[in-house]
Amino acid sequence: MKAILRTGKSKSEINRLRREGMIPAVLYVRGKEGETLAINSAEFNSYLRHVKSGHLPTTIFTLVDEKGSERRVLVKDIQYAITTYQVMHLDFEELIDDHKINVKVPIECTGTVDCVGVKLGGVLRQVIRHARIRCLPKDMPSFFELDVQELGLKQSKRLKDMNIPETVRPLIDMNEVVAVIVKR
């Protein structure tokens, strides 16, 4: 994805960028001041269409500046227009190989079709959809998988029931309930 360094920070400059089909953005690098950028709106939206729902926090993008240098980044914040749902602003965080990052990793429940509790008339309720973790960029999982196939009525699975790699440190209580089977 191409990134253009922008100098104008006034409201009129930002509105002009949006009229030209650009998205104003800020790139944060550890220990430095944020860099103001502009991203092509059509290009970003085409990438965004291919990202699975809920997986944006763990999707790594490559920004290419005017000089041709590449930077691997994560989207830290995205702002949408209320009425049109157009992307209005982006915040990126640059990934540095030897620096740990905090990230929200999506949790996907598998085995819901064959779940014992669902077959008995219950409903699967996923209480937590993301787990906050701290890890190196190379160790970041794209999602966590939680098998709920053997859950019966009124049974639950907790964060500690997931397979979390040793290189990943959870930043939330591992006794939190992720999914539960409830009566209709």
UniProtKB/Swiss-Prot annotation:
rRNA-binding among keywords: yes
Disulfide bonds: none
GO molecular function per UniProt: 5S rRNA binding; structural constituent of ribosome
Keywords attached to this entry: Ribonucleoprotein, Ribosomal protein, RNA-binding, rRNA-binding
GO biological process: translation
Gene Ontology CC terms, in alphabetical order: cytosolic large ribosomal subunit
Description of how the protein assembles with itself and partners: Part of the 50S ribosomal subunit; part of the 5S rRNA/L5/L18/L25 subcomplex. Contacts the 5S rRNA. Binds to the 5S rRNA independently of L5 and L18.
Function: This is one of the proteins that binds to the 5S RNA in the ribosome where it forms part of the central protuberance.
Family: Belongs to the bacterial ribosomal protein bL25 family. CTC subfamily.
Protein name: Large ribosomal subunit protein bL25
